[in-house]
Amino acid sequence: AGDVKVLNGGPMMGRAMSNLASPVVKGCSGITVLGGAAALRGRESSCIKCAKCVSACPMGLEPYLMAKLSRRKLWERLEAEWVTNCIECGCCQFTCPADIPLLDFIRMGKQEVGALIRARAAAHATKK
């Protein structure tokens, strides 16, 4: 048996499972096992500004820009680009000819922007 990748969820929105002893919980849509070439990520190359990710985004967002801002840790700019509206469907990453892990960067950015929003709310609450 070759290398396989096990996902909690489907091939586009699923998250890789590092521990196969993890329980399957109610919110899990399924377990996906990828083998062969499907288990490997393509080699990332530079964005060619083709905008396929933009066309594929059901929320009308600009995934290439959000990934770029996330890489550069520009959280305020990322918040202004409505990163929290991303539904993490994976369509952008699936269509990217440059094999950029857009969804990984967007998820990281959403976490950081969420922390920024919570910190801002906490600071505002302490002022009252």
Language-model features: locations:
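Redox cofactor-anchoring modules in respiratory/redox and cofactor-processing assemblies
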Residues: 1-98, 103-113, 118-128
